[in-house]
Design a protein with these regions (language model features):
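Hydrophobic helix-coil surface modules that form long, contiguous segments used
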Residues: 1-133, 162
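Short, aromatic- and glycine-rich surface loops/edge beta-strands on solvent-exposed regions
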Residues: 348-361, 434-439
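Amphipathic alpha-helical substructures
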Residues: 211-299
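Acidic/His/Gly-enriched intrinsically disordered linker/tail segments
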Residues: 157-220, 224-228, 247-248
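Short, compositionally biased serine/threonine- and acidic-rich segments at solvent-exposed termini, linkers
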Residues: 361-371
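C-terminal outer-membrane/trafficking sorting elements
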Residues: 375-384, 388-452
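Zinc-dependent metallopeptidase catalytic helix centered on the HExxH motif
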Residues: 122-179
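Beta-strand-rich binding/interaction modules
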Residues: 285, 289-336, 342-354, 403-407
């Protein structure tokens, strides 16, 4: 309610405007919002706004995006806000229909920097695409499902930040998205510690709204979860999280989120979240690779950690192999322990190996080195027959001494280790591709083994 002598004043609040009633010198504007609303998302603003709207088709059930802007900002705003419709459509396609589509969405300009994601109307200090995307994203992650405590603020801010990155991915392309991730990782790893989840009781506002941890690291952990699960399962899991009747239009804590994701994905994510959500810091990788011998290349992944709270960061590691004649091959290795070995079929000579070319892992100061293992001895051993279904013979020169051997599967898991013998029985092995590592007096020798 305000004095109508200022006839140009317009009020905005949550939900739908129901009426304006002028009585004498007073004008009263009524808004109605029919959803449960967290106290910090209640919004009221009155000033000499100019208004204009955009229409979201919403699959035949249209609703308005109403923009309340200062007269002096009108020309710039009306050029900047139409993209809101495109972003709304993107988020609706990835997750679900806008949660308040039977009311409205809107922007109300205010005099602070940044924005505030009040339910159905975000207060905006400007109209950049990134800010529009971030505040709109909160209508799903923060408003429909709200963090259950300030310790869980990443469920709001981490996901809103990640969704602004998804706008870059979908509107600007892969390279721009990679640049965005690289910039975030640089910020995250600028300090050796810090967890996404806020560990301390009664955290300060500066810790709650820490841009490095709650926003950037929260966003990259969301992205790493996507890479861990695969995009299809990731988006399906988030759709189910938002639709969960125990959480929607209510509150969720991190444990609720994890349980919801695990239920859809049908996978135990305890180790992932212990490392990346509750643990502090980041890994540093050293990747050792060998030139292919008999089309078999070996990769060893070593890791150190920046903070003592995590003894090892489990993650899927992507390597891009570049060939001497312009060939390329991308491999994804599920790294679960330090010093893990992987064997991959590579049909060309490798010139160099790129670690995490798309910036999908929070890490820093990584190295890729060529193994000192000599290929000169790789042909000293042969296996016959291959493929085999019962046993195979190891053929070697007399002057080569083999102490022991280990057989690995394609995931780098050690299936068995044994002392050297001329004939190896594999009748109990499942069919598939394996790799043998021989410990000889001349060095390590690697051979592929195919079991039918």
């Amino acid at each position: 309610k305000f004095n109508s002598n200022n006839q140009e004043n317009i009020a905005v609040s949550n939900g739908l405007e129901i009426s304006q009633i002028t009585t004498g010198q007073d004008k009263t504007t009524h808004f109605k919002h029919q959803y449960p609303i967290p106290a910090y998302l209640i919004a009221i603003s009155v000033t000499n706004y100019l208004t204009y709207n955009h229409i979201v088709d919403n699959n035949g059930s249209p609703f308005e995006i109403i923009n309340y802007v200062y007269p002096e900002s009108y020309d710039d705003a009306i050029e900047s806000t139409p993209v809101t419709v495109d972003i709304m459509n993107l988020f609706s396609n990835l997750f679900e229909e806008y949660p308040f589509s039977d009311e409205k969405y809107g922007h109300a300009q205010f005099g602070w920097g940044g924005g505030m994601e009040h339910t159905t109307v975000s207060f905006m200090g400007g109209f950049s695409r990134g800010l529009i995307a971030h505040e709109l994203a909160h209508q799903w992650f923060g408003n429909k499902v709200t963090c259950g405590s300030w310790n869980d603020i990443w469920l709001n801010e981490g996901f809103a930040t990640y969704l602004s990155g998804l706008v870059i991915e979908n509107f600007d392309g892969v390279q721009s998205f990679n640049n965005w991730k690289q910039s975030r990782i640089s910020s995250i790893t600028s300090q050796p510690g810090g967890s996404v989840y806020i560990l301390e009781d009664n955290p300060s506002s500066s810790r709650i709204f820490d841009g490095r941890l709650s926003y950037s690291k929260g966003a990259l952990v969301a992205h790493m979860l996507r890479k861990q699960l695969g995009s299809n399962v990731f988006y399906e899991s988030l759709q189910n999280y938002l639709a969960d009747q125990n959480l929607s239009y209510g509150y969720a804590q991190s444990d609720d989120f994890i349980a919801s994701i695990e239920e859809t994905a049908q996978v135990d994510l305890t180790e992932f979240f212990d490392d990346w959500l509750y643990g502090q810091g980041y890994p540093t990788y050293t990747i050792e690779w060998s030139e292919p011998a008999e089309n078999l290349a070996r990769f060893v992944i070593n890791q150190t950690q920046s903070h003592w709270t995590v003894d090892f960061f489990e993650s899927k590691v992507t390597l891009k192999l570049n060939g001497t004649n312009g060939e390329s091959q991308t491999i994804i290795l599920d790294n679960t322990f330090d010093g893990q070995e992987f064997f991959q079929t590579v049909l060309f000579n490798i010139s160099d190996v790129e670690f995490d070319p798309d910036f999908d892992i929070i890490s820093k100061n990584n190295q890729v080195v060529l193994s000192l293992t000599s290929n000169d001895i790789q042909n000293d051993i042969s296996i016959f027959p291959t493929p085999t279904n019962n046993k195979f013979k190891i053929i070697k020169p007399r002057d080569l001494t083999i102490d022991s051997l280990a057989i690995y599967n394609t995931a780098g898991q050690n299936i068995t280790t044994m002392k050297y013998k001329k004939y190896i029985d594999v009748r109990d092995f499942s069919s598939g591709q394996y790799f043998i590592k021989f410990y000889s007096d001349k060095g390590l020798i690697f051979k592929p083994l195919l079991i039918k």
